[in-house]
Structure formats: C-alpha cells, structure tokens
Amino acid sequence: MDAISKTERRKQSLSVVLSTYGPGLLVTAAVAMAAQFLSEHYGAPAMLMALLLGIAFHFLAEEGRCVAGIELSAKLVLRIGVALLGMRISVDLLIGLGGGTILLLVSAIVATILFGLVAARLLGRGWRLALLTSGAVAICGASAAMAIAAVLPRNEFSERNLIFTVLSVTVLSTLAMIGYPIVAEYLGLDGQATGIFFGGTIHDVAQVVGAGFSVSPEAGETATLVKLIRVTMLAPVVLIFSLVLRSVPQEGASIGKRAPLVPGFVLAFLVLAGFNSAGLVPVLASEVGMAISRWALLAGIVAVGMKTSLRRVLEVGGDAVALVVAETLFIAVFILAGMYYLGHS
C-alpha cells in the first residue's frame, strides 16, 4: 500500500512539473525549430532568427501557462547548451595551432575586453554592458554573451543588454562573413593567414566557417580551428569574471542569493573539455552532445527574446551600437597587426 502511495505521489509530482514547465518548454522548442528551418532554407543565421522570432512572441512571457517554462529555457536550458560546448574542446586543438598564434589569440581577447571597458567609460555606458559586448566580440559571439550574462549581477537592464548584444554581434558576424574575404584578398593573405584572420576576428562559429570555406578549404579548416581556440577561452574568462565580481560589492544589482564561486555550467564545460582531451568521449557522443548544445542554445535565445520587449531593446541607444562596432574593429586591427608581427601573410 505504501509503495502504491509513493508511486502515486511521484506521478502527481511529475504531472505538476509537466503542467508547470511543459507549455513554455514546448513553445520555445517549436520556435527554435522554426528558426532552424528558416536558417537552413534562407541562409540567415539561426541565432538571429531565434532571437527575432522570440521577440515576436514576447506576449507569451508576460502571463499565462508558458511563463514558467520560458523562464526555465532562458536559464537552465541555455546554460546546458553552453556547458556542452566543452565537448568540442581538446588539447590537440592547442597543440595543432602553435604557441605564437595561441598567444596572439589570448592577447587579443584580453586587449578587447580592456578596450571595451575603456571605450564604454568614454561613451558613458556601464561596465556590465562593456563586459557583455567585449566578451562576446572577443570570444564566441552569442554563446559567450549568454554565458557572461549568467554570472553578471542582474539589474533592470540585464535582459535588454543581453538581447542587444546577441543581436548586434550576430549582425556584425554576418557582415564580417561577407566583407572580410574582400579584406583578405585586398591584403594578399594566403590560405592559412586568411583562416587565422577570420577565426580570430569573426564572432560566431557558423559565420567563421562560412567565411573560411568561401575562400578555400585551407582557409576554412584553419579558421574553424582558430575559432575553436577562442571558444576554449570561454570558461576561463567567465570564471575570472565570476571570481572578480564576487569580490567586489555591486551597486544597482538585484538582491538575491550570491552566485556560486564556480558556476555549475562553467565547471561542466571544463570537465567535458577535460574528458574530450583525454579521449574519453566517443565520437558519436560528442556529435550528439554538440547537437543537443546547438538546440539548447537556440531554445535558450528564443526564451531570452520572448522575455524582452523590442521597445526596451531600441532604448539602448546609438552609443551602445558604437561600442560594439568599435570593439569589432579593434579586435580585427589587433589580430592583423599581430599576424604581420608573427610573419603570417
């Protein structure tokens, strides 16, 4: 009798969970699939489609049965997607690229973030937006923005700033995918140098691949490798941000429990990267993990879009646009200067 009552309680609990979160999760999944469909059939970036479609369904996040599930997608599902990116990372990537190029990439990331903080101050913008935009530009675009946003102290502008950052870096990545091959040809870069330029400067992975292989197989393969090295820096940078922000009293942050010393999704990213480096992750498992990561990130950005009013995004101002454009130009010039110093041409 007791066993039957336990079974009934489990069924009731499951029913409550499904009824609470199910509608919102299903809605974000459906919109994510629509975004992927549009991306595959019309060539638009999937992240951009997910974001715009999410904003169009903003009314679903205001009230009703979908609210809880949308909130879960915007937080837990999104962080699962970031954590699973670790399955793409291995020590072999670092070895295959060479010390000089790796040092250039690390220097570019640090310099871009510092430049973003200084530029934001000159433009009268806050440090939260500076860390968000410069981190996204320096590392891996929308994925980095979502990971960094998860450890920043929250205020009334948090979701607006995240949406703006994802939107701006995705648009700039698409423009770079079109324009940077012209720049590379004008500068007379060879296949490897072109790949380093694309992989070290374009924000999102998909656009890096598109730009690289539009030039040559060598440029595409090198660009992808270089970009994955930048993705490797995501966890260390987010961890450093988290540690620094914990040690500094924050003004204007919403009151709540303190963030953990090491965010769980960052720890999972590092563990998965370690397993992959040790050869403990089968190829099939890695492919499945990356597919789940891609869909989780799409669903997460759909949910973030749903939670944000387009009117509030438009309030961000021209100086914020100038900031992210300046950061994009800065990392491009920095990488090109470093390449010429190292003899890549």
Curated annotation (Swiss-Prot):
The UniProt entry, under InterPro entries, shows: UPF0324_pro (IPR018383)
The protein's predominant localisation is membrane
Localization, per the record, is: Cell membrane
Tell me how this protein sits in the membrane.
Answer: Multi-pass membrane protein
Annotated Gene Ontology cellular component terms: plasma membrane
Q: Which UniProt keywords apply?
A: Cell membrane, Membrane, Plasmid, Transmembrane, Transmembrane helix
Cited Pfam families:
Cons_hypoth698
Which chain regions cross the lipid bilayer?
A: 13-32, 42-61, 93-115, 130-152, 161-183, 193-215, 228-247, 262-284, 291-310, 320-342
Thylakoid as a keyword?
Answer: no
- The family this protein is said to belong to: Belongs to the UPF0324 family.
Q: What is this protein called?
A: UPF0324 membrane protein RB0971
State the taxonomy lineage.
Answer: Bacteria, Pseudomonadati, Pseudomonadota, Alphaproteobacteria, Hyphomicrobiales
